[in-house]
A protein has these predicted regions:
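Alpha/beta-hydrolase superfamily serine-hydrolase fold, recognizing
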Residues: 1-267
Length: 267
């Protein structure tokens, strides 16, 4: 794997078990910045609970890597997860089940892995959790960037932005058609939701200016429609940083523990 895809692996002190649960946590940074080291605290906490925990880097969209996009990043994660499990096994920690999670961009990538790529995983994906990750790209939902105006100008801007994100050529005439869903499906976790989707915990800020809050409503509705066990925590007074609703923020972290105990119990 390339430099960008190196991973940090945290393994528990107890080596006596026949198998372990793996939790992958993907870093935030708007697909352009960030590093697995940013999540050392989260990874150490997961490890202290008895999990094998891993942070994975992915190639960031930049002047050096103008070809990087959500799709290429998601494919790097897809390739990296089996390598993480193989390394854990080599160290004496065979993996029998896993969860994947992340913040913001990392949450977007975690959902894509759990919803789109679970059948390629080295162990069953039992759950996904995360905060403020985009799961679909409909211009009418992206008022945070003024892309919901329905004008020639705003549609052109939306086509440009979403095209870069997907690594596809998107033209405004695609909006509102099934061809648009087809073009964006590989980067839209929403479009992979079905009855077999992994239990999902997610938190979103109602005043998010960085990614689309309305997209999270669509996701909640899709998970509900397909009977997927999930919790959708809305921070009514917060933006992307989930900074103004201490009670709900605390509830999100409590729910992480609940979900791990329920879906990925440490035996």
């Amino acid at each position: 794997m390339g430099e960008a895809n190196k991973f940090d692996l945290y393994v528990p002190a107890d080596t006596s078990k026949e198998s372990y649960g793996l939790v992958v946590y993907l870093h935030a940074g708007g697909f352009t910045t960030g590093d697995k080291a940013d999540d050392a605290g989260m990874l150490q906490w997961l490890c202290s609970k008895g999990y094998v925990a891993a942070g994975i880097n992915y190639t960031l969209f930049s002047e050096q890597h103008p070809e990087a996009n959500i799709y290429t990043q998601s494919m790097e994660i897809k390739e990296a997860v089996p390598a993480v499990a193989a390394q854990a096994e080599k160290l004496g920690y065979p993996i029998d089940a896993m969860a994947i999670a992340g913040g913001s961009a990392g949450h977007c990538l975690a959902m894509l892995y759990a919803y789109r790529d679970a059948d390629t995983a080295p162990a069953p994906v039992r759950m996904v959790f995360g905060a403020v990750g985009p799961s679909s790209f409909y211009p009418e939902d992206w008022g945070c960037y003024g892309l919901d105006q329905g004008t020639e100008e705003s549609n052109a801007a939306a086509a440009g932005l979403f095209g870069v994100m997907a690594g596809r050529s998107i033209t405004p005439d695609l909006f509102g058609t099934s061809a648009y869903d087809e073009a964006m499906k590989d980067v839209s976790a929403l479009l992979w939701v079905d009855g077999g989707t992994a239990p999902s915990l997610m938190a979103y800020g109602k005043h998010d200016k960085v990614q689309s809050f309305p997209a999270s409503i669509r996701l909640d509705e899709a998970l509900t429609a397909h009977g997927v066990p999930h919790d959708y925590i809305v921070l009514e007074h917060s933006g992307h940083g989930l900074q103004n609703d201490q009670q709900e923020f605390h509830q999100y972290y409590q729910k992480i523990e609940e979900y791990l105990d329920r879906y990925l119990p440490v035996e």
